[in-house]
From Swiss-Prot:
Quaternary structure and interacting proteins, as annotated: Component of the large ribosomal subunit (LSU). Mature yeast ribosomes consist of a small (40S) and a large (60S) subunit. The 40S small subunit contains 1 molecule of ribosomal RNA (18S rRNA) and 33 different proteins (encoded by 57 genes). The large 60S subunit contains 3 rRNA molecules (25S, 5.8S and 5S rRNA) and 46 different proteins (encoded by 81 genes).
GO molecular-function terms, A-Z: structural constituent of ribosome
Localisation per UniProt entry: Cytoplasm
Keyword Metal-binding belongs to the record: no
Source superkingdom: Eukaryota
Organism from which the protein derives: Saccharomyces cerevisiae (strain ATCC 204508 / S288c)
GO biological process, one term: ribosome biogenesis
InterPro entries registered for this protein in UniProt: Ribosomal_eL34, Ribosomal_eL34_C_sf, Ribosomal_eL34_CS
PANTHER family, alphabetized: 60S RIBOSOMAL PROTEIN L34
A GO cellular component entry from the record: cytosol
Pfam families, A to Z: Ribosomal_L34e
Protein name, UniProt field: Large ribosomal subunit protein eL34B
Length: 121
């Protein structure tokens, strides 16, 4: 019959954080090796796609790595993907353009009203 292994930590339950892998040591003994949970890639806050250029780590491990592993040198780097940043910049530009156009149209209508009043007198 195969050799049995037991958990090496205090938690006796088969939970997601207490997974083990049975490993044979050089001495021929089977031991339980605790397996860490897999890390997920950081996602874009707008579209949900995986962010490129950012390390895939467990949340606590981000505290131990340098800033270059956590960001990219761009606006919203490490938070939004390049396509979403491009979209935001274009949208902001178009909104500003629309404000300027609205202001110019308003000034033109006011000037037209003033000229009508002068021509009536």
């Amino acid at each position: 019959m195969a050799q049995r292994v037991t958990f090496r930590r205090r938690n006796p339950y088969n939970t997601r954080s207490n997974k083990i892998k049975v490993v044979k040591t050089p001495g021929g003994i089977l031991r339980a090796q605790h397996v860490k949970k897999l890390a997920t890639r950081p996602k874009c806050g707008d579209c949900g796609s995986a962010l490129q250029g950012i390390s895939t780590l467990r949340p606590r491990q981000y505290a131990t790595v340098s800033k270059t592993h956590k960001t990219v040198s761009r606006a919203y780097g490490g938070s939004r993907c390049a396509n979403c940043v491009k979209e935001r910049i274009v949208r902001a530009f178009l909104i500003e353009e629309q404000k300027i156009v609205k202001k110019v149209v308003k000034e033109q209508t006011e000037a037209a009203k003033k000229s009508e009043k002068k021509s009536k007198k």
